[in-house]
């Protein structure tokens, strides 16, 4: 029996919908194709354990899973839940009439509970753009994804809830977040206030001009003269983030996995201060599994580079390119 359902792959700060096709036939082997990485291939063991613990038997037949488009590398363990649901649907354990209306994502523990994922916000945006009726994901990420309007977001605790939902024996309560209320609620006070600075009127004037016009600023002075202290207080005099800027900034931090678990939106200007020994990848981003670097994480905020004379030469070249 052939079953089709949908997951998502995060590329940069955007998400691409991934079609997951599962076919069951006579045999005893398990095939997973579509350019999966090691974490995706290891999902077989997590799925087997999660199903057994929750009273379901892994099918004793040949299972072929295809993840399309095949030219996009599928990375991470967030495909565990859609793969498990697809396998059960292909063998008749789950009804398939509602599967194609939902986007499913989540990492499984061995007991069937769900672990949080990275990039829930860009995935939710992609789900809304593609016209999905709902988005099923771990409950830890539900508020983050629910800031996207016109999309039903269902936060689930374990795989049993998802199975019962598709079989019609349980209803899932959507997570509802008023985006504007959440935005204003998260506009907290800055930990460092520019009003605390006493004296240094010329430097304060330069900082105010830089903040008002969005200019770069180079501060030179003797050790202990207050350069770092004043730089840390610069975000408190920057213009407030707009809602569009907040969503843009939150997407970047969501992909990097740096969102506070109690907050679904970043509503204040970010302040990033990387160490002077920061590597090129940490500064610009990238790596084997591409992640945003300090430059991206400081988007719409302040990137503070202290002790410039001790930084590696590649930092300056990267900043010129950026």
Locations of regions flagged by a protein language model:
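Walker A/P-loop
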Residues: 218-263
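Conserved P-loop NTPase
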Residues: 2-4, 10-17, 276, 281, ...
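Conserved alpha-helical scaffold flanking the Walker A/P-loop in AAA+ ATPase domains
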Residues: 206-208, 264-265, 269-270, 280-303
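Peripheral, non-AAA+ core regions of ATP-driven protein-machinery
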Residues: 1-229, 266
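Alpha-helical scaffold elements adjacent to nucleotide-binding pockets in ATP/GTP-utilizing enzyme cores
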Residues: 46, 50, 83, 122-126, ...
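Conserved AAA+/SF3 P-loop NTPase catalytic/coupling segment centered on the Walker-B
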Residues: 275, 279, 291-322
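Beta-to-alpha transition at the N-cap of a short helix in the ABC ATPase nucleotide-binding domain
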Residues: 203, 243, 314-316
């Amino acid at each position: 029996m052939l079953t089709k359902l949908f997951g998502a792959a995060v590329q940069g700060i955007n998400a691409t919908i991934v079609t997951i096709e599962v076919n069951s036939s006579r045999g005893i082997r398990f095939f997973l194709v579509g350019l999966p990485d090691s974490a995706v291939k290891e999902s077989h063991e997590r799925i087997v354990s999660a199903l057994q613990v929750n009273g379901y038997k892994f099918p004793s037949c040949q299972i072929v899973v295809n993840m399309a488009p095949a030219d996009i590398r599928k990375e991470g363990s967030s495909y565990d839940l859609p793969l498990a649901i697809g396998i059960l649907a292909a063998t008749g354990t789950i009804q398939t009439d509602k599967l194609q209306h939902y986007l499913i994502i989540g990492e499984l523990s061995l007991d069937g509970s769900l672990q949080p994922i990275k990039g829930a916000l860009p995935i939710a945006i992609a789900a809304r753009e593609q016209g999905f009726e709902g988005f099923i994901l771990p409950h830890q990420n539900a508020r983050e994804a629910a800031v996207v309007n016109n999309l039903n977001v269902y936060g689930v605790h374990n795989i049993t809830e998802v199975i019962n939902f598709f079989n019609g024996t349980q209803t899932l309560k959507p997570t509802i977040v008023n985006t504007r209320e959440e935005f204003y609620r998260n506009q907290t006070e800055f930990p460092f206030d520019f009003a605390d600075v006493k004296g240094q009127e010329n430097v304060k004037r330069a900082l105010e001009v830089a903040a008002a016009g969005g200019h770069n600023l180079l501060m030179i002075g003797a050790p202990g003269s207050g350069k770092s202290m004043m730089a840390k207080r610069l975000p408190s005099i920057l213009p407030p983030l707009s809602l569009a800027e907040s969503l843009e900034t939150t997407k970047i931090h969501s992909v990097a996995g740096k969102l506070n678990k109690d907050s679904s939106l970043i509503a204040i200007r970010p302040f990033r201060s990387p160490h002077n020994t920061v590597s090129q990848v940490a500064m610009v981003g990238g790596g084997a599994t591409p992640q945003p670097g300090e430059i991206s994480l400081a988007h719409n905020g302040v990137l503070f580079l202290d002790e410039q004379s001790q930084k590696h030469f590649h930092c300056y070249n990267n900043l010129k390119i950026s």
